[in-house]
């Protein structure tokens, strides 16, 4: 439920507005003026709520439903109880999310943590920093020398932007974020605790132990990237670490030096991407995936959760397991292991 204490709707909304905004087909046009008071899950629905449902396996969830309206596919429309506005959509979840973003814009990009706009007198901003009109810098933020920040960008309380970094327009830098040796594009979101541009993990054997390898590269984060809380992105050693346009990275991910991630990738929580890996476009890594160093992972690849990848993966393939291998082979290996275990169990019971 969207608690109005935290998420105030940007406007009043009717069923007709939802149909117009999403392009969904309203079964009964007479219900267009009905008010939508809130967005809700099926289990939390009630009078005034807009919900969505997709997939025939969820048809039982519609029994006894009370709501102002339902976004659903054509195959489920006849199962919606009478009196509820039916909005037929090819993509109910996507349309429901679009309504949520329109109605509660602060839920996807906070406008301010402290309820203030403009440049706070309690922020430290170096005189050589250049901040465009329309940017917000909250109390306790630190902006180093030579930094540039674009219009519409929010630098939240206690964020630290190191010298000569560049941040584009309409980006969001949350509390506790540190940025150094980095160029960040437009519409980028860095959630609390993100670390960008610290030195990578590089050592060589020396005369008296381990000598540190200088990390002289940068981090380049392209437009429309989102990085979750407490994720770390190390700067390159000589080459740059690059996060491609539109890529979304979950919380608690480690991205090592010289990694290059392509466009529109998804990286789930607890992944570890070792140094100098190259990942193509539209690739998805499930939670807790680990990549060995210097791997080349193709475009449109899917790697199952908790997999350990030790080899390159060609474009378009699905891999899983430890060590990771093509998904069908992994399934066969699991089946064979189970079969061997069952055979041994049967043999021991016959003795």
UniProtKB/Swiss-Prot annotation:
Pathway(s) this gene product operates in, as recorded in its UniProt entry: Bacterial outer membrane biogenesis; LPS lipid A biosynthesis
Any GO molecular function: N-acyltransferase activity
Keywords assigned: Acyltransferase, Lipid A biosynthesis, Lipid biosynthesis, Lipid metabolism, Repeat, Transferase
Pfam families for this protein: Hexapep, LpxD
Active site: 257 (proton acceptor)
Enzyme Commission numbers on file: 2.3.1.191
Record's GO cellular component terms: membrane
InterPro entries for this protein: Hexapep, Hexapep_transf_CS, LpxD, Trimer_LpxA-like_sf, UDP_GlcNAc_AcTrfase_non-rep
Catalysis performed (reactions): a UDP-3-O-[(3R)-3-hydroxyacyl]-alpha-D-glucosamine + a (3R)-hydroxyacyl-[ACP] = a UDP-2-N,3-O-bis[(3R)-3-hydroxyacyl]-alpha-D-glucosamine + holo-[ACP] + H(+)
Family: Belongs to the transferase hexapeptide repeat family. LpxD subfamily.
NCBIfam families: lipid_A_lpxD, PRK00892.1
Assembly: Homotrimer.
Name of the molecule in the record: UDP-3-O-acylglucosamine N-acyltransferase
């Amino acid at each position: 439920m969207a608690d109005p204490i935290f998420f105030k709707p940007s406007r009043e909304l009717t069923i007709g507005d939802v149909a117009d905004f999403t392009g969904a087909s309203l079964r009964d046009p007479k219900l267009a003026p009905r008010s939508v008071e809130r967005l809700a899950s099926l289990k939390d629905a009630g009078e005034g709520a807009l919900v969505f449902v997709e997939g025939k396996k969820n048809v039982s969830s519609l029994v006894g439903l009370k709501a102002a309206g339902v976004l659903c596919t054509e195959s489920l429309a006849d199962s919606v109880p009478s009196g509820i506005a039916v909005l037929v959509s090819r993509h109910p979840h996507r349309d429901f999310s679009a309504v949520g973003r329109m109605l509660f814009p602060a839920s996807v990009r906070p406008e301010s943590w402290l309820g203030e706009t403009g440049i706070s007198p309690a922020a430290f901003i170096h005189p050589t920093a250049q901040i465009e009109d329309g940017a917000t810098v909250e109390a306790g933020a630190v902006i180093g020398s030579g930094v540039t920040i674009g219009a519409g960008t929010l630098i939240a309380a206690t964020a630290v932007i190191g010298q000569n970094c560049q941040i584009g327009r309409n980006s969001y830098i949350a509390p506790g974020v540190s940025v150094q040796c980095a160029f960040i594009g437009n519409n980028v979101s860095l959630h609390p605790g993100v670390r960008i541009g610290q030195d990578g993990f590089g050592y060589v054997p020396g005369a008296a132990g381990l000598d540190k390898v200088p990390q002289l590269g940068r981090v380049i984060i392209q437009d429309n990237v989102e990085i979750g809380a407490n994720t770390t992105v190390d700067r390159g050693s000589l080459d740059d670490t690059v996060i491609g346009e539109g890529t979304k990275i979950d919380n608690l991910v480690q991205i090592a030096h010289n990694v290059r991630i392509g466009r529109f990738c998804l990286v789930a929580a607890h992944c570890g991407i070792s140094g100098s890996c190259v990942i193509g476009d539209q690739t998805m890594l499930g939670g807790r995936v680990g990549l060995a160093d210097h791997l080349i992972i193709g475009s449109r690849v899917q790697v199952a959760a908790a997999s350990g990848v030790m080899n390159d993966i060609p474009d378009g393939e699905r891999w899983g397991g430890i060590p990771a291998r093509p998904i069908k082979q992994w399934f066969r290996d699991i089946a064979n292991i189970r079969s061997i275990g069952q055979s041994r169990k049967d043999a021991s019971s016959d003795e």
